[in-house]
Amino acid sequence: MVRVIAMDGPSGSGKSTVAKIVAEKLGWFYLNTGAMYRAVGLFLADRNIPCDENAVTGNILKQADVDFDPDGHIVLNGNDISDRILTPEAARHASDYSKLPAVRKLMTALQRKIGLSRPSVVEGRDIGTVVFPDADHKFFIVASPKERARRRFLQLKEKDPGTAITIEEILKQQNERDSQDQKRALAPLKQAEDAILVDTTEKTIDEVVEEILARL
């Protein structure tokens, strides 16, 4: 049976970085489901499709070809959008459109297909609760709101040194997104009962990786 490690948590908690390194150390595939939702969100927003379940249909979603290239970069309809999905705009669209049943259904099916094709470290917001409830190992990665905003700010500044966004603005957007993710009726962000809680606020990446590997 294909093995799966599930890592959930809010954006900026460090789960993406940690999941990727853990996957590399194990020689497993790294599946970033948040990137997939951001890709679909951008696809729909670019086409000015309302965030409404009557507007976002299966036929429209079939036009969004979401995949990963050999280097693990997210690809939408043949275009590498790895940089674009890091923007606050992409995060907002992902949170909005992910509330729609048609989007969740398509993404969940695609994530299961990819994740079960080989041993995988899968990270997102509902992996241990919805996508892979029977995962071999589950971790819920968190960090303080201020630390998460600081990390996102540094990430954006690295990509675009001239960006005008402030940490305060990122924190405000982040809090709004967290509230949406936690309160949505469909697959809300929450810790699975059998998931191990890992707080990365005052830990280095290496410390978190070693902590997780020690628990496998």
Located regions from the model:
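ATP-dependent NMP and nucleoside kinases share a basic, alpha-helical "lid"
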Residues: 82-159
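Walker A/P-loop
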Residues: 16
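Small-molecule kinase domains that catalyze NTP-dependent phosphoryl transfer to phosphate-bearing small molecules
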Residues: 60, 111-118, 125, 129-130, ...
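ATP-binding Walker
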Residues: 12-13
